[in-house]
């Protein structure tokens, strides 16, 4: 199981670390992921809404029924039902019905409480934006509060000014929800400080 078992395992590990190290605040936990990680980060905040305070999910394959079948079969497993029957001329035919074993994230939407930021590339040809839109539709139907951005020129990877925009939105999202720091809404170039820090070493 690529979703439920790892999510429980991650939560347990974070709880153990927070109990062991006083500098870790176990009441303010955030999670981020892209692609399969985007699937997991959205699933995490929907599965454990009282544990995760914030999540950023980008380009997530939230509904594996419309994702790459080869990937899904290898990593999630597919149940196959084989039916045989005869048509009106008496010719025997075999039909195959496949179902994905993992539930789509939109089925978890009812559990979600707060703190989710979704991103998708408008021309993503790896994980179709419909994956994110299906989750969005479920969240709206459940009257849930969340934020979402569509990056117009982006495929599965974010690049250029869109990548910078995405990074800044993610930093600000986590700063607000995990640190109660609204000063992060100001434009701060963290890369500049990281480069300067490297030069001092």
Where in this protein do the model-derived segments appear?
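Active-site-proximal cap/loop segments of hydrolase catalytic domains
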Residues: 1-201
């Amino acid at each position: 199981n690529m979703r439920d078992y790892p999510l429980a395992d991650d939560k347990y590990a974070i709880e153990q670390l927070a109990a062991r190290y006083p500098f870790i605040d176990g009441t303010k936990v955030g999670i981020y992921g892209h692609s399969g990680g985007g699937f997991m980060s959205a699933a995490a905040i929907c599965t454990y809404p009282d544990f995760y305070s914030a999540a950023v999910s980008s380009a997530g394959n939230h509904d594996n029924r419309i994702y790459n079948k080869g990937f899904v079969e290898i990593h999630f497993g597919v149940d196959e039902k084989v039916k045989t029957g005869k048509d009106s001329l008496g010719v025997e035919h075999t039909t195959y019905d496949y179902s994905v074993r993992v539930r789509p994230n939109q089925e978890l939407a009812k559990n979600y409480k707060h703190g989710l930021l979704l991103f998708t590339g408008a021309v993503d040809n790896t994980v179709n934006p419909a994956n994110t839109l299906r989750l969005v539709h479920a969240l709206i139907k459940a009257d849930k509060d969340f934020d979402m951005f569509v990056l117009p020129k982006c495929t599965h990877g974010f690049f250029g000014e869109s990548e910078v925009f995405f990074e800044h939105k993610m930093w600000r999202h986590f700063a607000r929800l995990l640190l109660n720091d609204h000063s992060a809404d100001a434009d701060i170039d963290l890369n500049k400080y990281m480069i300067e820090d490297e030069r001092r070493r």
